[in-house]
Each structure stands twice: as C-alpha cells, then as structure tokens.
Design a protein with these regions (language model features):
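DPxDG-like acidic metal-binding loop motif
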Residues: 70, 100-126, 142-144
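Residue-level signal for inorganic ion chemistry
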Residues: 13, 41, 70, 105, ...
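N-terminal beta-alpha supersecondary unit
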Residues: 2-86
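Phosphate-handling active-site elements
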Residues: 78-89, 115-136
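Short pre-catalytic strand/loop immediately N-terminal to key active-site residues, enriched for Gly-Thr
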Residues: 29, 88-101
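Short coil/turn segments at secondary-structure boundaries
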Residues: 61-65, 97, 103-104
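ATP-dependent small-molecule kinase catalytic core of the GHMP/sugar-kinase superfamily
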Residues: 2-6, 14-30, 122-181
C-alpha cells in the first residue's frame, strides 16, 4: 500500500496572543492561510512481524528518527488504531524551508496522519484525527484541513473563512529562528 501526500506551508495573516492557559500554553486568535509551497510525503505500508517506522528524505536539515514530528505522528497513529503490524516507510521531499515559521514540520505530521488514515481505509474519523493533531502541536489541526481559517484556543478551534486571492513574497533570513507561541 502506498500514497503520496502534498503538504502545504502556512502563514499567519494575523496573530493575537491572549492570556496564558492552565496547561501552560497561550490562547491565540490567528488567521492562518495555506500557500502554494509544498513538502511531499511518499508513505508506504507493508505487512510485517512487528511495527517499524523508517523515515528518509532529501534534506540534511531535519532528523530522520524518533525526534522528527512525522515519526511521532506515525507512532501516535499506530497507538490509536487496532491495526496488525506493518513496516511503514515515509519519504519526506522537503521544499518548505526549515525553521522559517511556515509550519513545515507540522504540515508534514498532519500529512502523515492523513496519509496513514488513507492507506489503512480510514480507521479514524476526522474528529479523531484532529484529537491526535492537538496532541502533537498547536497548528496541526489547521494543517490537517488547510485553506484560510480563524484559529482560536491553542489552535484547535477552527472556523473556515472566505478565500480571496492574494500575492505574497516570503523572505527567509539566513539565520534560523524557532517560532514559539
């Protein structure tokens, strides 16, 4: 079983950071927008004696091990489904710049959940996928659906907004910056 998933980058058109939550995160209100810059995942799954996850890709800037959010997403999917063991291989064709604030890792993790769900004939509902997304990060719920949406809470509350075409230019400085909300 094999599938290829297109994972779009996203930008924040607006961002309002509100009070701190009991869980240590901040409440946000943000209009997020997917853009036409993509990573691509090639996901394959074959029956095996035990579950095994292997990551590979074209970038030297990301880890291909358990520290990668894609790996964590695959593990979370396995833990929340009652599937027989498989060897899961995920190739990450990285085009979204790393550490650019464009949700490259988040969109790849959301794409992993979506792709595995597709390969295994949708054992999880969209609501269940969103619950897994929320466990992995604040912008994964948006990345699962994309488009233009108002996000609230920690990023788990989504409201679709009308889309108006716009042209943008993105500039990434040479020095990486980690985005933290």
């Amino acid at each position: 079983m094999k599938t290829k998933i297109q994972c779009p980058a996203k930008i924040n058109l607006t961002l309002k950071v509100a009070g701190k939550r009991d869980d240590g995160f901040h409440n946000i209100e943000s209009i997020m927008q997917t853009i036409s810059l993509y990573d691509y995942l090639t996901i394959s799954a074959n029956a095996a004696e035990k579950f095994d996850i292997k990551l590979s890709g074209n970038s030297t800037e990301i880890p291909y091990n358990e520290k990668n959010l894609v790996y964590k997403a695959a593990m979370l999917f396995i833990e929340h489904t009652n599937l027989p063991p498989h060897k899961i291989e995920i190739y990450i064709d990285k085009n979204i710049p790393v550490a650019a604030g464009l949700a490259g890792g988040s969109t790849d993790a959301a794409g992993t959940l979506y792709g595995l769900n597709k390969i295994f004939n949708e054992p999880l509902s969209l609501t269940e996928l969103h619950k897994l997304c929320a466990k992995l990060g604040s912008d994964l719920n948006f990345c699962l659906e994309g488009g233009r949406q108002m996000t609230k809470g920690r990023g788990e509350v989504l409201e679709k907004l009308p889309f108006e075409k716009m042209n943008i230019s993105l500039i990434k400085p040479k020095k990486d910056r980690k985005s933290v909300v």
